[in-house]
């Protein structure tokens, strides 16, 4: 019998994570002054979920959460940015191999590694994927979409760098450090 790739726990996390991402995306964002581009707290939450549940869950939480936000609050999804949100979760989820927050350790080395990974993830998603898909799918003007991508990417890097680091650090403090318990005789 094949081992199921997605556990019940992960599926529930994807559902709840997508709903929280949607709510944070709508009510936890600040406008940047660039049309349709906001400072989003949802990506700090996505980072935590991606590190906890891995790349597939990270992708699905970002993709489904962003799609739901667009559908519920704007009427239809902007698929290029929905896909980019999934890419952020996917790449950060691959970082779970290097950043084991469930082991109760999130010190300088892990903070540096997390921020390096999230900068790469946001750079790929917002500087490359979202604007390129905007041009290919929606025939949007080149200068507009790359400006939106750069502003969105930089704001997400800063938000995840600050809020994500604090959120993940606080979460890791709730975990028991590996090897910290001893058997009493």
UniProtKB/Swiss-Prot annotation:
Principal location listed in the UniProt entry: membrane
Keyword Cell membrane: yes
Membrane topology classification: Multi-pass membrane protein
Protein origin, superkingdom: Bacteria
Keyword line: Cell membrane, Membrane, Transmembrane, Transmembrane helix
Compartments where located: Cell membrane
Xref: InterPro entries: ECF_substrate-spec-like, UPF0397
Any one Gene Ontology cellular component term annotated for this protein: plasma membrane
TM segment ranges: 11-31, 44-64, 71-91, 111-131, 149-169
HAMAP family: UPF0397 (MF_01572)
Membership in a protein family: Belongs to the UPF0397 family.
NCBIfam families tied to this protein: PRK13661.1
Protein name per UniProt: UPF0397 protein CPR_1556
Organism, scientific name: Clostridium perfringens (strain SM101 / Type A)
